[in-house]
């Protein structure tokens, strides 16, 4: 197997073109042997595309069926053997739903789609609507296989249009057929409306829709799409003014906090977010961000003058030894001060009246427990696997690994 090792010298360094030049029998034997490193077996499976020796099929299928084998190898083999109808009864067996190896439930669904199993369509549509790119790609591949085999109308009929993910698939198919999907901006599900606006390409059609859109939210999606297509801020602001400048009102969130949060998160918020946040951000001026070195220096001086002996500040990423975010951490005694990079906002891990008074005298704004707990509705932000509204303290002092 020296030639295989030459073309795959280390994990992540596979030369698939080189592997394709090797004997198919040798590759099949290598893939089927769990004694070899999985990171070499996977590229060998990919190099077997469209040339699997028939005499090795049964052995390769046994590797797919073995839950003790490495998931990456089993997934690669499912892709390789996507035309083997004998796999379908096993794939549809209820036991497959109990497998939880990473990526396997999705791979089973994709394989069912590749093999023409229309009963997998609804679950594939759910996968295709996932915010995770890998899961989305798997779902789309399975649905595309069903469309290729049966035609788009059959698959659309299987799905219906009650669920948002089914309507999202319908929007994608209409767009693929070069049909106008502007009307989907009025879909009651924001993820579907967001998908529709991302597919629009004709500014004139979007302008025309502004007069016919049935809801303010649909008009906001149109304004957002129009700005994406033209970059014309003045036009976007005119539309926003015509609509009455609608925004999500949040009790306790004053203009200073709102501006800092809005211009940090609205442009990259999750697709289920309220479009009022997106358009408000386009139509308002961002606040001036503080000079971080000056801000840290001022906080250090204030705590030092108060006799609290602060340690040098570090970024939240350095403090956690991974990731990044929107604040610095400054230790003082047994406590920690958090200094936001979004404005003059500070808080501490434990309440400290001396630190608070010193910092407020130095021009900082202390974020107390009441303000920290304010939840910002409709602004969905990715935070440790969740995509949902979070509270002010998370937004001002955000860290992500």
Could you say what each language-model-derived stretch is?
Residues 35-37, 67-70, 98-101, 131-132, ...:
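Short inter-helical turns and helix N-cap capping residues of alpha-solenoid HEAT/ARM repeat scaffolds
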Residues 134, 365-401:
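Acidic, proline/glycine-rich low-complexity IDRs
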